[in-house]
Amino acid sequence: MSGASNIKKEPEAGEEVLSAAAMKFQRHYPATRVEISAPDALLMIPMDIILIEQVLINLMENAVQHGKTTTQISLRLTRSDDLAVFEVSDDGQGIAPALLPHLFDGYLTRDQEAISDKRRNMGIGLSVCKSIVQAHGGAMRASNRPTGGALLQFTLPLEETSHEDQRKSTPD
């Protein structure tokens, strides 16, 4: 992904992308329960719905494939100021703390591979997810939940901003 100009964004309902991703995921992982939480008010988000849906599916697949004990995944959408916040959390084993700083790098060192216990492919998929989110003007992060399991979160701007708009809003 070379930049946001390659992404065709249309205003889409956030809860619809969550539902579509969950439905496609559950075709392949019917034993994993997926819970969806979204605001009551319709949240329209400028996005390439196919790419964002793929990010959500990839995050859910990683939760099952690498969480080992994952039986439930929660998809949550909230609004924080001018951002849509997407969260994918699970009840699996979580992410090894040594991997967290490098999770989106796209590669793992031999030591990190040993820690990750056969998670070599995870980094490549997550680096692509991060590139897609960044091309939309968003950010991505990962952490472990205090109650167990992993939490992967990404944000997308709620309004389309051009480079010209950004220059106008920057004080001289």
Functional labels for PLM-detected ranges:
Residues 10, 33-43:
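Conserved catalytic submotifs in the C-terminal HATPase_c
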Residues 125, 129:
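Short alpha-helical Gxxx[C/S/T] motif in the catalytic ATP-binding
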Residues 90:
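Acidic ATP/Mg2+-coordinating residue in the GHKL
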Residues 63-64:
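Short helix-loop "hinge" at the ATP-lid/N-box region of the Bergerat-fold HATPase_c
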Residues 95-107:
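Short conserved segment of the HATPase_c
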